[in-house]
């Protein structure tokens, strides 16, 4: 029986579907469409009426749909190092034409060779096992084992059975149907990997790169020199967008987009703040699912309305003393880092079993950009988990721990995000010293499942539970 969803959650899903549907339709009409980093000022593109897709959002979706490993491997096969970000590898493979595909058709025959990407027929007419001795159906997903194929290679084939079989084998979910870009928008306030990633896409497709460089900020504020530097880049970006669209910049439309983005951000932060209630009216894990909206549509009024509707639903849960969490809250934890999208069920299962509700999420409120003028917009976009000093990063998190009544911290040492993971050992020490709460870390990856070990994760979660219980005993809880 399908899980019922609330009107607010459904509205959020509809917004994301609309963004990608309109993106594809714009491309089909012959309009220029782009790809954008998640923290590029969306207000600019929105004010020009440009349709853009978000490779980070796409990569997370591809990974969650179990194609992260094969897409990462495809990128490695064409020369990208497996040390770089999993999102980048998936996106670079996608930009090169690779798509997730089924190895076999419904009758158990090979559609394509998993090693060469070419069609491979079974000489005996039917296959029970593939070339590696694996069953036709993956027992974990109950789906055919996945591989990749290349859309450019398929397009070059003559019309016929092989071309049809390979086209039909391509995975059809939404994240696999983002059209190729005519320009890219990059802001490296997230990390410097973003810069080379988007440069590579622009070079491969011979398209414009609109770049906004945000300096690392070692202070507790954004100084005026950085504001002037970034504002000058916004002026350049506007001129580039005028060239792409053939339109003049419209300040009134820009102002409206800024109002929409602020309204969305405030509603999003309000949703996040409901985790301060004890017990929380929802499971903080849900914030990861809702982030697609705040990334792809924060400049749209529909996103603001959807988050406001969700906030009203959460307010009602608080009044009634109910929750949408599927378990009783026994401990409240902060999840540090980006989730392992390919392994969400593995992440959630031991949390549910131990009654651990995630009531602190660093990643989610980082997309709540609130400002009153252009200088404040610049300052808002300067703040990201990887673009500020460790002192400011600790202060943010310790404020979240206090406000959201966190009992312990679970840290994801993310192989894909080394800047974020690099300073976490020191942060863990600070949390224990300053806040008196236990922490535990586990190894993983936001997109490549090969870097996640379920047994290690379960052991670390159990250790965190025992440490929190010991802490409770000391406090006489």
Curated annotation (Swiss-Prot):
EC number: 4.2.1.167
GO biological process: glutamate catabolic process via 2-hydroxyglutarate
Keyword annotations: 4Fe-4S, Cytoplasm, Flavoprotein, FMN, Iron, Iron-sulfur, Lyase, Magnesium, Metal-binding
Keyword tRNA processing: no
Intracellular or extracellular location(s): Cytoplasm
Pathway membership: Amino-acid degradation; L-glutamate degradation via hydroxyglutarate pathway; crotonoyl-CoA from L-glutamate: step 4/5
Keyword Cytoplasm: yes
Reported regulation of activity: Activated by the HgdC. Reversibly inactivated by oxidants such as 2-nitrophenol, 3-nitrophenol, 4-nitrophenol, 4-nitrobenzoate, carbonyl cyanide 4-(trifluoromethoxy)phenylhydrazone (FCCP) and chloramphenicol. Irreversibly inactivated by oxidants such as hydroxylamine and nitrite.
InterPro entries on file: FldB/FldC_alpha/beta (IPR010327)
One Gene Ontology term of the molecular function aspect: metal ion binding
Cofactor(s) needed by this chain: [4Fe-4S] cluster; FMN; Mg(2+)
Cofactor: binding comment: Binds 1 [4Fe-4S] cluster per heterodimer. Binds 1 FMN per heterodimer.
Family, per entry: Belongs to the FldB/FldC dehydratase alpha/beta subunit family.
Function: Involved in the fermentation of L-glutamate via the hydroxyglutarate pathway. Catalyzes the reversible syn-elimination of water from (R)-2-hydroxyglutaryl-CoA to yield (E)-glutaconyl-CoA. The dehydration mechanism involves a transient one electron reduction of the thioester from (R)-2-hydroxyglutaryl-CoA, generating a ketyl radical. Prior to (E)-glutaconyl-CoA formation, the ketyl radical is subsequently reoxidized by electron transfer back to the HgdA-HgdB complex (CompD) to avoid change in oxidation state of the substrate.
Protein name as catalogued: (R)-2-hydroxyglutaryl-CoA dehydratase, subunit alpha
UniProt source species: Acidaminococcus fermentans (strain ATCC 25085 / DSM 20731 / CCUG 9996 / CIP 106432 / VR4)
Lineage: Bacteria, Bacillati, Bacillota, Negativicutes, Acidaminococcales
Gene encoding the protein: hgdA
């Amino acid at each position: 029986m399908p899980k019922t969803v609330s009107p607010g959650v459904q509205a959020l899903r509809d917004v994301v579907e609309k963004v990608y549907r309109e993106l594809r339709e714009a491309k089909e009409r012959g309009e220029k469409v782009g790809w954008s980093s998640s923290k590029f000022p969306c207000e600019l593109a929105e004010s020009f009426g440009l349709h853009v897709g978000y490779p980070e959002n796409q990569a997370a979706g591809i990974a969650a749909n179990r194609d992260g490993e094969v897409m990462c491997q495809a990128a490695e096969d064409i020369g990208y190092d497996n040390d770089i970000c999993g999102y980048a590898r998936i996106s670079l493979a996608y930009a090169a034409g690779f798509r997730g595909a089924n190895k076999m058709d419904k009758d158990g025959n090979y559609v394509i060779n998993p090693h060469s990407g070419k069609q491979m027929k079974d000489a005996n007419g039917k296959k029970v096992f593939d070339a590696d001795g694996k069953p036709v159906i993956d027992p974990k997903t109950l789906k055919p084992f996945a591989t990749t194929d290349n859309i450019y290679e398929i397009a070059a084939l003559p019309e016929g059975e092989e071309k049809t079989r390979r086209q039909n084998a391509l995975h059809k979910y939404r994240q696999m149907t983002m059209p190729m870009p005519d320009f890219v928008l990059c802001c490296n306030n997230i990390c410097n990997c973003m810069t080379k990633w988007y440069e590579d896409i622009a070079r491969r497709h011979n398209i414009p790169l609109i770049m906004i460089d945000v300096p690392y900020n070692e202070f507790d504020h954004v100084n005026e020199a950085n504001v002037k530097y970034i504002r000058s880049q916004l002026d350049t970006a506007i001129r580039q967008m005028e060239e792409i669209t053939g339109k003049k910049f419209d300040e009134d439309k820009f102002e409206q987009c800024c109002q929409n983005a602020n309204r969305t951000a405030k509603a999003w932060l309000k949703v996040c703040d409901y985790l301060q209630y004890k017990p929380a009216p929802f499971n903080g894990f849900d914030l990861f699912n809702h982030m697609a909206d705040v990334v792809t549509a924060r400049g749209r009024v529909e996103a603001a309305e959807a988050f406001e509707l969700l906030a009203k639903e959460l307010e009602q849960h608080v009044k009634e003393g109910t929750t949408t969490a599927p378990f009783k809250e026994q401990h409240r934890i902060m999840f540090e880092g980006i989730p392992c999208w390919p392994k969400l069920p593995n992440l959630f299962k031991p949390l549910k079993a131990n009654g651990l509700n995630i009531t602190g999420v660093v990643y989610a409120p980082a997309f709540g950009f609130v400002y009153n003028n252009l200088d404040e917009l610049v300052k808002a976009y300067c703040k990201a988990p990887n673009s500020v000093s460790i002192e400011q990063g600790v202060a943010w998190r310790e404020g979240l721990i206090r406000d959201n009544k966190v009992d312990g911290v679970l840290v994801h040492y993310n192989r894909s995000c080394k800047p974020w993971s690099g300073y976490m050992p020191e942060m863990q020490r600070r949390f224990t010293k300053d806040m008196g709460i236990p922490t535990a870390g586990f190894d993983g990856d936001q997109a490549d499942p090969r870097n996640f070990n379920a047994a290690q994760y379960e052991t670390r979660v159990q250790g965190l539970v025992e440490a929190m219980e010991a802490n409770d005993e000391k406090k006489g809880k």
